[in-house]
Amino acid sequence: MTIKNKMLLGALLLVTSAAWAAPATAGSTNTSGISKYELSSFIADFKHFKPGDTVPEMYRTDEYNIKQWQLRNLPAPDAGTHWTYMGGAYVLISDTDGKIIKAYDGEIFYHR
C-alpha cells in the first residue's frame, strides 16, 4: 500500500468516525424527520397488521411494554397507550384493548 493510499484511507476513516461519534442530546428524543419511518402496515407472526387492528394478547404483556422509548427515538406515548415491538416494528397500542394506533419501522432506532 502506497503512502498516498494510506493517507486517503486515514482521512476517510477520520471523516466517517466523526460522523458516527456526534453525540445525541441527552434526555431528549429527536423527533424531527421520523415520519419517514411511519408504517401504514407491517407483518408480524406471519400476519398482516395495520392501525385499527388488535394485537395478540402476548404483545400487551409487561414483557413487551417498551418503557425506554426515548432510547429508541420514539415519540412519547399518549396517556392510555404504550409502545411494543412486533416483527421488526415499534407499535403504539392502546392499554385497554390493544388496538394499534401507530407503527414505526424498527430502523427508527438508528435515527439521528
Curated annotation (Swiss-Prot):
- Would you identify the family this protein belongs to, as annotated? Belongs to the RcnB family.
Q: Tell me the leader sequence span.
A: 1-25
Q: Which GO terms describe its cellular component?
A: cytosol; outer membrane-bounded periplasmic space
Q: Give the protein's recorded name.
A: Nickel/cobalt homeostasis protein RcnB
Pfam short name (any one) = RcnB
User: Which GO terms are recorded in the biological process aspect for this UniProt protein?
Assistant: DNA damage response; response to cobalt ion; response to nickel cation; response to peptide
Instruction: State the organism named in the record.
Output: Escherichia coli (strain K12)
Q: What does this protein do?
A: Influences nickel and cobalt homeostasis. May act by modulating RcnA-mediated export of these ions to avoid excess efflux. Not involved in nickel import and does not bind nickel or cobalt ions directly.
Relate the induction remark in this record: Repressed by RcnR. Induced by nickel and cobalt.
List, in alphabetical order, the Gene Ontology terms for molecular function in this entry: copper ion binding
- Residue ranges spanning the membrane: these are none
InterPro entries named in the record: RcnB (IPR024572)
The gene designation is rcnB
